[in-house]
Every structure is written in C-alpha cells, then in structure tokens.
C-alpha cells in the first residue's frame, strides 16, 4: 500500500476493486471481475466494522480523512453518503429532471442530498413511514414526500411525460 501510511485515518470503500478490469476502467467498480473485487468486505472478508481489517486493493479503496473532520462526520463517507453520491452520479440526473427516491432511511436521505446537487426540477421521495416523510418535509422542503398510495399520482403530476427520469431504490 502506497497511497496511505500507518496511522492515517481512512474511510474504506464498501467495495474492493482492482482498477484494471473492463468495469473498473469505466468507473463501475461494483462490477469488478477480480476474485477479490466487488462486495468482499463484510461478505467474503470479515472485519468491515472492526478496528483493523485487511483491505484488498487498498490503494484504490481507501480515502484519507482530512484533519478537522471528526470521526462522527467521517462515518457517513464510507458507505451511506458514498452510496447516495454514486447513485446520483450514475443516475445521470439533468437540470429539470423528475427524480424518484424509494425509501427515506439514512441512505435515501443521503441520495436525496446528492441528487439535489444536480438541480433536478422535482424530487419525489416515497416512504411508507409517516415519521420519515415528516423528516423529509422538514429536512428538504423542496422535495415532495409521499406515501406508497400517492406515488403514482405524484409522479404523473410532477413530470412532463408522466414518469420519472431517474429512480433510486435505496
């Protein structure tokens, strides 16, 4: 490992990837074809939540946590926020698009934040739990939070073509 040094605080990508296969070279590291690639940590390799873990291809999968960023804030970077960021990136959201997010748990909320960076025209969050819908309304008033029974009408009413341009099930 040459990208980090002993003692560095790092966030570990939830997926390991070789960086050289067809999919890695195109940015789709979740489809890495290497035997140690993909969802190795926590699946084929124990220790994803441990103090110490051996990370295959650590030069690609570790991100140094900057000084001044607390452990608490850095916690989201390794999985929940990274999932939302990646989803928004590969979802190809364009300004003015109608975006649908299915689920308003921690990953759904991070996806919402990252989707908003792309200036969609409308973001609709479908969540069955009324408390989570209320949180979305308070947290992101520009988003429309609806229950499953309202989702079809909400999408039709908020889209020029009757459907969502990007859908994220998180």
Q: Which role fits each region the language model picked out?
A:
Residues 1-24, 66-68:
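Glycine-rich beta-strand-centered segment in the early N-terminal region that forms part
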Residues 5, 48, 94, 118, ...:
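Structured loop/turn residues at beta-strand edges in well-structured enzyme cores
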Residues 8, 142-143, 165:
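Conserved acidic residues
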Residues 13, 168-170:
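Short, well-ordered coil/turn residues at beta-beta hairpins
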Residues 20-102:
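NAD(P)H dinucleotide-binding glycine-rich loop of Rossmann-like/cofactor-binding domains
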Residues 64-149, 153:
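Mid-domain Rossmann-like dinucleotide-binding core that forms the NAD(H)/NADP(H) cofactor-binding site
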Residues 150-162:
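Short amphipathic alpha-helix with an adjacent loop that forms part of the alpha/beta core around
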Residues 162-168:
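Short SAM/SAH-binding signature in class I
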């Amino acid at each position: 490992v040459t990208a980090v040094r002993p003692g560095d605080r790092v966030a570990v990508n939830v997926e390991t990837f070789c960086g050289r296969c067809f999919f890695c070279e195109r940015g789709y590291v979740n489809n890495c074809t290497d035997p140690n690639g993909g969802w190795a940590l926590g699946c084929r390799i124990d220790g994803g939540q441990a103090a110490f873990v051996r990370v295959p291809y650590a030069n690609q999968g570790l991100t140094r946590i900057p000084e001044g960023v607390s452990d608490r804030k850095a916690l989201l970077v390794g999985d929940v926020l990274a999932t939302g960021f990646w989803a928004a990136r590969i979802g190809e959201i364009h300004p003015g698009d109608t975006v649908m997010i299915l689920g308003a748990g921690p990953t759904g909320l991070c996806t919402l934040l990252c989707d908003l960076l792309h200036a969609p025209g409308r973001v609709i969050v479908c969540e069955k739990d009324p408390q989570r819908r209320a949180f979305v309304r308070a947290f992101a008033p520009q988003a429309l939070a609806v229950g499953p029974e309202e989702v079809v009408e909400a999408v039709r009413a908020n889209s020029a073509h009757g459907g969502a341009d990007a859908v994220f099930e998180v």
